[in-house]
């Protein structure tokens, strides 16, 4: 059983390329059955890799996307993936759609990882994440913008 990683993504590019990618993702979401057998369902990242014309066996795609929405030249969604973010999928998207760049924020508590590639904080302002169990056995989870 893997540790699960929750990630949020923002993909930004030309309105045309973002619209094409969004169309592919929405078409996959409307399917009754995934055309690539898997344990995740119709929104498995491997289905997206396959729909982009690539071999899902050569890309780390061990998870699924959720809640995709498009606004102008921006696409936003979340993923639940095993052990860490599956950025190979998004690197592939950037090769297929040269104008698109992706930004992400991910948390994988089992591996004590909090990651982002948004150095300027344009989409994800938090730079630090802390999980604490108090002596009273209370769990606290907080994000911070800086070291203070």
Give the ranges of each region predicted by the language model:
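Intrinsic low-complexity, intrinsically disordered or marginally ordered coil/linker segments
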Residues: 1-148
């Amino acid at each position: 059983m893997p540790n699960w990683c929750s990630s949020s993504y923002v993909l930004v590019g030309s309105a045309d390329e973002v619209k094409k990618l969004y169309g592919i993702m929405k078409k996959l979401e409307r399917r009754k059955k995934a055309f690539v057998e898997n344990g995740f369902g119709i929104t498995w990242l491997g289905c997206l890799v396959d729909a982009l014309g690539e071999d899902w066996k050569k890309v780390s795609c061990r998870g699924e996307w959720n809640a995709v929405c498009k606004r102008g030249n921006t696409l936003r969604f979340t993923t639940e993936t095993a052990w860490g973010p599956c950025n190979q999928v998004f690197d592939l998207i950037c090769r297929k759609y040269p104008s698109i760049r992706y930004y992400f924020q991910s948390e994988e508590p089992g591996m004590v990882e909090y990651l982002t590639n948004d150095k300027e904080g344009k989409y994800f302002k938090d730079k630090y994440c802390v999980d604490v169990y108090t002596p009273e056995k209370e769990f606290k989870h907080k994000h911070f913008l800086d070291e203070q």
